[in-house]
Amino acid sequence: MVINAKENLHIMKMEDVQINRIFWLWKYWLPLGKLTILAGAAGCGKTNLALALASTITVGGNFPDGTHCEHLGEILIYSTEDDPADTLKPRLIAHGADISKVAIITARRSEDGKLEAFDPTKDFPKIEEYIQNAPNLKLLLIDPIVSVVSGDLNKATDVRRSLQPL
C-alpha cells in the first residue's frame, strides 16, 4: 500500500489486490454476501418476487430460469410496509416456502428488557450480530430499502452511507 501524505489517500496497486471468488445463491443473479436491489415502480411486484425467491431458497426449489437452488437455507425479513400475518406469511405459503426457515424482525429489546420499535438506522449492529450467529441464513430481505436509509433520500452520500453496512 502506498500512502500519499499530502492528500491523505490510501492507494493500493492492483497487483496487490487479492482476488476473491463470488459465490452465488442464484447464479449470475443473487450473489451470496452482496447487496442486491430489486428496483421498480410501486405495485409492480417487487415484494412478491422477493418472497418467491425467498421461498425457493427455503425449500431448495427452482428459480425462475429453471436452475435449482443449491444453497437452501434460512431467510430473515425486515419489512415496514407489509404485515406478517395478513400479507407476508400468506404469500410465503402460497409460494411454497418452508415457513419454519423464515424469521421476521418485529422489535428490539432495550437495555432494561422492554420491547421497543426496531430502528435499522441505529440498530443495524443487532442484525449483523444475528447474521454472524446464523450460519444457515442465506438471505436478508429488507422491504422497502428506504426504511434503512437515514438522512436525505435525495443525497447520494446519505443513501450510500446508510447502505454501506449491508
Residue ranges and their predicted role:
Residues 1-9:
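Charged, amphipathic alpha-helical linker segments immediately N-terminal to NTP-binding catalytic cores
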Residues 31:
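Residues immediately N-terminal to the Walker A/P-loop in ABC ATPase nucleotide-binding domains
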Residues 35:
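Walker A (P-loop) ATP-phosphate-binding motif of ABC ATPase nucleotide-binding domains
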Residues 49, 53:
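Hydrophobic positions on the alpha1 helix immediately C-terminal to the Walker A/P-loop
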